[in-house]
Amino acid sequence: MTKERSRAAKRSEEELLDIKQAASLLNVSEASLRRWTDSGKLPCYRVGDQRARRFRREDLVAFVSVSQETASPAQGADRPDSVKNAAKTQVAGMDIAYHDHICAIYGRPAGRLKLSVPLLREGLKAGDICFLNATQPGKAHILKVLREVYPDVHKAIKDGQLIFPALKRNKAEMLDQLEEMFLKATYSGEQKLRLVGDMEWALSVDWSEQEVYEYELEYNNTLGHRFPIISLCQYDVRVFSSKGILDALKSHEDTYKYPLRDCCI
């Protein structure tokens, strides 16, 4: 009986998926799986001296099913990673590609608007799902000018085409929230997304500049290059230190595909 139990336990452990296999099955990042298991959203087992995560296939399938039901996916909707050749869009004279994660540096109030407003305006006109992360004053400034060039802003907000994610104090929770929003949009059939992050918002919820830098790097690795999204992060030199601005440039390598004169405002 002891040998049978031992063989059963070994067989059960062999049937578990490691984190790399689970990430491949769900088509998500390993970082996402860690966040979901840490938050209790996704069950996992811990095995060995290293307490490595292991997953049952049925738990992963059930987790995806719940996510899809929540998103009300369109029949035959593509998964996020399937859109690899998304078109470019012109913003302030630049042809910006989807999947690019770029930054803009500005030093005066009008600089906040130069790229953010046309990016959102053209996105709303094209039917893209758009996200705006900003402090309340920053959001009000951008929306005021956006309404002047796109009168249907209120309708876009009401219809869920223009979304304002909650500004989270914890960067893992912020990334998790964005990932869920992007998954919901893409599972429901949306092929193109846009995000504007006026990054003073992160300081307003007490992130350090180092946390902002780490967040940008993880966004790059787990979201920005994975989803069919144009991501624009804006930095005000009057708010961020010189090191904070340097880190912004280091964490947005896609920016160097474009003329810096258009990104440094």
Swiss-Prot record:
Annotated region of DNA binding: 17-36
InterPro entries assigned: DNA-bd_dom_put_sf, HTH_17, MEDS_domain, SinI_DNA-bd
Keyword annotations of the record: DNA-binding, Repressor, Transcription, Transcription regulation
Cross-referenced SUPFAM superfamilies: Putative DNA-binding domain
Record flagged with keyword Transcription regulation: yes
Record's function text: Transcriptional repressor of the dcmA gene and of its own gene.
Protein name per the record: Transcriptional repressor DcmR
Native source species: Methylorubrum extorquens (strain DSM 6343 / CIP 106787 / DM4) (Methylobacterium extorquens)
